[in-house]
């Protein structure tokens, strides 16, 4: 069974909602994002959603717009988002999805 389906099945079996956490990858920088992901996953997050920063996120609210701006200013790119996932995979097999335009 795929990781995402397993996460929801496990939550359902435990009679609870799945805990899905969102972070803008690279906000405020790569290392802080990695540390935040590690902390969230250690805290029991079932599924991690990583926002891929975009230069013109008009559909997002101000908070996500500013997060994307900080991430881009710190050098985050699509390639670095995949590097972040590779680093997360060193300590977690939790499902990861992307939020992108």
Locate predicted features.
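N-terminal amphipathic alpha-helix/helix-capping segment at the start of soluble metabolic enzymes
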Residues: 1-20, 86
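Short secondary-structure boundary/capping segments within folded domains
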Residues: 10-14, 28-30, 38-42
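Short, well-ordered coil/turn segments that N-cap beta-strands
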Residues: 14-19, 44-46, 90-96
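Active-site mouth loops of central-metabolism enzymes
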Residues: 19-35, 95-101
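Conserved, mostly hydrophobic/aromatic
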Residues: 21, 40, 48-51
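Glycine-rich, proline-tolerant flexible connector loops at the mouths of alpha/beta enzymes
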Residues: 27-30, 45-77
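Glycine/small-residue-rich loop that forms an oxyanion/phosphate-binding "nest" at active or ligand-binding sites
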Residues: 62-101
């Amino acid at each position: 069974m795929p990781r995402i389906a397993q996460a929801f099945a496990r939550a359902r079996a435990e009679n609870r909602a799945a805990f899905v956490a969102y972070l803008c990858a690279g906000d405020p920088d790569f290392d802080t994002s990695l540390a935040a992901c590690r902390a969230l996953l250690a805290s029991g997050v079932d599924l991690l959603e990583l926002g891929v920063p975009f230069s013109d996120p008009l559909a997002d609210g101000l908070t996500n717009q500013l997060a994307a701006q900080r991430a881009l200013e710190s050098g985050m790119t699509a390639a670095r988002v995949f590097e972040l996932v590779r680093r997360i995979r060193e300590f977690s097999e939790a499902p990861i999805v992307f939020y992108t335009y």
